[in-house]
From Swiss-Prot:
Modified residues (Phosphoserine): 134, 407
Function: Component of the transcription coactivator SAGA complex. SAGA acts as a general cofactor required for essentially all RNA polymerase II transcription. At the promoters, SAGA is required for transcription pre-initiation complex (PIC) recruitment. It influences RNA polymerase II transcriptional activity through different activities such as TBP interaction (via core/TAF module) and promoter selectivity, interaction with transcription activators (via Tra1/SPT module), and chromatin modification through histone acetylation (via HAT module) and deubiquitination (via DUB module).
Protein name according to UniProt: SAGA complex subunit NGG1
Positions with biased composition (Basic and acidic residues): 11-22, 90-108, 162-219
PTM annotation (Phosphothreonine): residues: 464
Keywords: Chromatin regulator, Nucleus, Phosphoprotein, Transcription, Transcription regulation
Short sequence motif named Nuclear localization signal, residue ranges: 606-618
Chief subcellular location: nucleus
UniProt GO BP: chromatin organization; chromatin remodeling; regulation of transcription by RNA polymerase II
Amino acid sequence: MPRHGRRGKLPKGEKLPKKEGGDNTPSKLLSSMLKTLDLTFERDIGMLNGKSVRSIPNKKTLLELQSQLDSLNEILGTIARGDQETIEALRKIRDSKNEKQANDEKQETSNADGQHESSTATEETNIIDKGVQSPPKPPPSNEISGTIENDVESIKQAADNMAKEEINEDKDLQVHRDQPREKRPFDSETENRATENENTQRPDNKKQKIDVDKMENDPTVKNPKSEFVVSQTLPRAAAALGLFNEEGLESTGEDFLKKKYNVASYPTNDLKDLLPGELPDMDFSHPKPTNQIQFNTFLAFVENFFKDLSDDNLKFLKMKYIIPDSLQFDKTYDPEVNPFIIPKLGPLYTDVWFKDENDKNSAYKKPSPYSNDASTILPKKSANELDDNALESGSISCGPLLSRLLSAVLKDDNDKSELQSSKIIRDGGLPRTGGEDDIQSFRNNNNDTVDMTLSQENGPSVQTPDNDIDEEASFQAKLAENKGSNGGTTSTLPQQIGWITNGINLDYPTFEERLKRELKYVGIYMNLPKDENNPNSDDPDWVTGREDDEISAELRELQGTLKQVTKKNQKRKAQLIPLVERQLAWQEYSSILEDLDKQIDQAYVKRIRVPKKRKKHHTAASNNVNTGTTSQIAQQKAANSSLKSLLDKRQRWINKIGPLFDKPEIMKRIPNESVFKDMDQEEDEDEADVFAQNTNKDVELN
């Protein structure tokens, strides 16, 4: 009879498939897989540890792991097939033993029936013989010898059958080793035998069930050489102890969670909001840094953010404007006016530097070429007296108001290139190449020594003849018309064609005064800041009171931002005042509650304090004992009454004042949303583009 392998082992004639690496057992394969993934097994906690636990390995590692898993699957499949064959062989042996027992029982029952019939026949003959009794005849020797021979023959036949079955089993195991379990003939044969022997083996069904249950659940029968099997031992032990088992229960629901964690109530919230923050997933086993910050320094930094509020904070919020200490008692300072005043211009750095040079060289003093004298900006003479020589000097100039208006309507600098390119195209003609013919004609026509190139680029000069000026004016009118049809800039004023106004010879001072009167009549030149040096004049201070420089523009922009920020801060402070008042009330409530808790702790300590034992005096021992017990009882009653009154006071304080506030964990928690959320949305809507609606309408119409 061949010896079958144990569970988890291959049959004797079969070997595991060998790999190139030499890892041909499951344990070696598992250890090599751990090395591939760079993992270690911590026996203390029963978990894996390594880099691959938190991050995904690279592709090369995963491919190597896949090959190892395939080989492990193949080896485990081979072992599983060997185990299945061993189990089927054991079933065959068990069935043969059961058949042998059944045959033996049948023979015993048949022999017993024959003996019973012979005994009944002898009894009947005795009765017929009228009470004549005779000893029972022993069975003949032939019968005894026949029964013995039959028993021996049956034993020999059973042994031969068992040997033949074992030989057939070995052959069938070799032939049907690669077949799945469902298609093997062993199961069908056992099923047929079971159906055939159902009627004959009914008394033995209970015994067979007991044997099957014992083989499947008893580790000593199924796996006799293993000391401990988890799948066979722990479930039965847990059921015997009445421990929790998830089988048969729903995986969701509060009752399931209560039974699983053995608690009276299970929270519906994960309590994440009560945590101080996200739990760090870091390794804190590294040594501390050498330049570690002191704890007192950290507390001093954090205290500004977590300290209790006070009345000073409320007073600060109720202040409309924050005024520096140096301006607190200055009555001339107005926080609504002074921050938005642009100071007057001081002396130019060129003047300051020139003055410093003159102070150093007092013997060689020179007049400053840069001066802030009002006479330098006043209108002088008229345009009729203007020539090329007067352009470099300041003897002829227009007033400050006219110069600003002219600068607002002058052409841009980039219009010069367009003017040059359009001049060389006449009525759809080709542009000139500027050859020798043009140069020769230019030289021949240059009778009055006029620079035509300069006149073409910068307009007519003061010495240009009248006919050339008229031609240039007509050309400018056509150019303006073409540019107006194609779209020009807003800073150019196209000239009208068909009429020419007769110029009035006005000097610049007169023209400046007429311009002021017209602007006042329209309502523009009004409510201007007065000149402090000349209060009787209606004109502003054009020298030091100008606000058209870059610094003044930047100051105006910053002042506009200051107005918006001041308005926003006032709204936010008004919204914070009720919140701070509520927080101050909560702080007062908490401080009183803490005082009550301290008093209760002190009273409880006095109540449970054991009095010191005094030395006994033998003379008046009885009197001292009586007085001691009475005083202790009185003190105990007083302590109990004071503790009870404190507890009642604390309970009344919590029940009466506590409902005015939210829960303590909510009052101490940092809010999840900003208290200015709605205000910020309103400000964003106010700062939106006012032309957005019109633009959308135009888009819809188009």
